Amino acid sequence: MQKLAKREEQIMQVFWTLDKAFIKEIIPELPDPKPHYNSVATMVKILEDKGFLAHEAFGNIFQYYPIISREDYQGHAMKDIVSQYFNNSYPSMLAYFAKQEKISESELSEIIEIIKSSKK
């Protein structure tokens, strides 16, 4: 799975939220400054070529929908982050956030419970 550029990820976030959308429905959901319609149309076509989106035709207008789930992309992105920055070590990643005080004790406990329940 390819890593997406920042604007591509923003567009995919909109599709994952809306499920299906025409290009004109995507633009208001994107952060400012709003890109031009043609720019969004180009990026949507690129996302379709990369295998992230597909479309259904309504005459000469296309409604697009994601074929890669948010969860699948998140998993791939997290594997890349852990590989690139934490030497493939999830404990190192968690330790980093704990040391930076980005994770509270209650959040750490919640993570431990999630890990325990996923092992069952």
Task: Please place each PLM-identified region on the residue numbering.
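Pre-recognition alpha-helix immediately N-terminal to the DNA-recognition helix
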Residues: 9-14, 25
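Short beta-strand "wing" residues that participate in macromolecule-binding interfaces
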Residues: 55
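Amphipathic alpha-helical dimerization/coiled-coil segments
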Residues: 76-117
